[in-house]
Regions:
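GIY-YIG nuclease signature motif recognition
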Residues: 21, 47, 82
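Short, well-structured alpha-helical segments
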Residues: 41-44, 48
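Generic leucine side-chain signal with a strong bias for well-ordered alpha-helical environments
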Residues: 15, 25, 43, 54, ...
Length: 102
């Protein structure tokens, strides 16, 4: 029985994108794509890759401005706001650094 408990405790969390975060990302990518489609795709790929890495080290980034969240900066201008529990990392928002948050 102890062995099963150890496996559950050491399980890697899953990644869950909230609807608001997906909408944020799409809005950012579409805005950039108007001038530079390649840069938009590169940014999208980087944000998605960095977000995927959060399941391995979810507590790596600083506490967020809202209690219970953390914030990961991507390319100095974008902030991925997320929360985590034992089983899931929730991507809550993807924001430009100039946006008012919260």
């Amino acid at each position: 029985m102890k062995h099963k408990q150890l496996l559950i405790r050491n399980a890697v969390p899953v990644l869950s994108w909230r609807k608001a975060a997906l909408t944020d990302l799409l809005t950012i990518v579409e805005y950039i794509a108007d001038d530079n489609p390649d840069a938009a795709q590169e940014l999208k790929d980087e944000i998605e890759a960095r977000a995927s890495g959060l399941v391995r080290h979810p507590q790596m980034y600083k506490q967020g401005r809202i209690a219970g969240t953390r914030e990961m900066v991507v390319k100095s201008n974008y902030i991925v706001v997320y929360a985590e529990d034992y089983a899931t990392v929730y991507i809550l928002r993807v924001l430009h650094a100039a946006q008012q948050w919260p």
